[in-house]
Amino acid sequence: MKPDAHQVKQFLLNLQDTICQQLTAVDGAEFVEDSWQREAGGGGRSRVLRNGGVFEQAGVNFSHVHGEAMPASATAHRPELAGRSFEAMGVSLVVHPHNPYVPTSHANVRFFIAEKPGAEPVWWFGGGFDLTPFYGFEEDAIHWHRTARDLCQPFGEDVYPRYKKWCDDYFYLKHRNEQRGIGGLFFDDLNTPDFDHCFAFMQAVGKGYTDAYLPIVERRKAMAYGERERNFQLYRRGRYVEFNLVWDRGTLFGLQTGGRTESILMSMPPLVRWEYDYQPKDGSPEAALSEFIKVRDWG
């Protein structure tokens, strides 16, 4: 089947609506929408929930940008895109909870297509989801990864292990020599065997995110915590900022190509702290995190 960008866009708009409704149902607070237009072509809907009952900040962004030619920074690595018009669309979200026992989560699904008259379109899907706990609970990690594994199952036995490894490799802070969290799924450049198969997988990932995340939120949101846990949460959020500004390809691409800065940086936590040469107390729950986030088979 020929790639159908309109069909993908409708799914993404509906996905943004559904996820916002699900997060509001858990939190009680409403999202505020900020619709925007891109001068060079396209636009989006940025939605943010702030200071809710459960979530300190949750951002769910839809964007659809298009243009007559790709920026040079994009075609340098993919010369086949030169001289083609393009469309790029996706839903990206990050949730930063109040309670340090509730992990931060991130998800993204996206579609890209580049066309020129007389030639086959170049297209692919990408996306995934990952979890960043501050305090490790094995049952949460197992649930997260089993949900990821189960949604991958209909698409092949090798899909989950391949995209889990890609996620582990991608969300890695080289300058800290540590993982950002416990991973999940990450895929990109997906265009085989055909459009329908790839689109179905992207839909499964988009829908699977809340199946993986919300049961963990419900399990942890009422746990008592104090200043020690809050300070550790803010300290560990620093790693999130470091990754996004130093290593994340999507953030860098967006900023380098004139993307909408407010939407790109919507993933940043509202509060964060750094502490020089911080060392958690031996044997403490805080010290246990470094071992918990090491790559392992959670399935």
Swiss-Prot record:
Highest taxon of source: Bacteria
Pathway listed: Porphyrin-containing compound metabolism; protoporphyrin-IX biosynthesis; protoporphyrinogen-IX from coproporphyrinogen-III (O2 route): step 1/1
An MF annotation (GO) of this entry: protein homodimerization activity
Family named by the database record: Belongs to the aerobic coproporphyrinogen-III oxidase family.
The protein's required cofactors: a divalent metal cation
HAMAP family the record matches: Coprogen_oxidas
Region (Important for dimerization): 240-275
Top enzyme class: oxidoreductase
Keywords associated with the record: Cytoplasm, Heme biosynthesis, Metal-binding, Oxidoreductase, Porphyrin biosynthesis
Function: Involved in the heme biosynthesis. Catalyzes the aerobic oxidative decarboxylation of propionate groups of rings A and B of coproporphyrinogen-III to yield the vinyl groups in protoporphyrinogen-IX.
Name by which UniProt lists this protein: Oxygen-dependent coproporphyrinogen-III oxidase
